[in-house]
Amino acid sequence: VDLKTGARVEGDLNPSSDTETHLELYNKFPNIGGVVHTHSRWATIYAQAGRDIPALGTTHGDYFYGAIPCTRKMTPEEIGGVPGHYERETGKVIVETFEGKDPDAIPAALVHSHGPFVWGKSPADAVYNAVVLEELACMAWQNQLMDRDIPPMQQELLDKHYLRKHGKDAYYGQGKH
């Protein structure tokens, strides 16, 4: 699809019914090159509960620089309207949720009562981030079963794990991807 208009530019199939959401993200988050929307079990559980996925351990910190936020509930006005309106408003609610947050460092959002939208530098990167998100959601759920009031990981540990892999002086792993 054309990222400005949403018009199909090749192929015979219609684009996703969530194209307007994707376009809002592409146009507001300039570094993304792919968007994935799933209804994966564990991340959707958090979305339906209206809860962020907390950063509880180093696995989370290796990929996401903080809690994965859940949007507010959408208003009846945002949900109603002509075809495409709801989907465009969904994108706007995600963008609103990221005011003061870095969408490159936290490449996912949970849409309240709906499910996750995940992005990356490329379509493959977005899919990878969606797989990681689902594993983090499952791990967080299990941790919260053990301790409902489990605190988030130490900020210093989150900084170390995220920045050694993604920071300007990254040294961990096989290079930036």
How would you describe each model-predicted region?
Residues 1-177:
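Glycine-rich flexible loops
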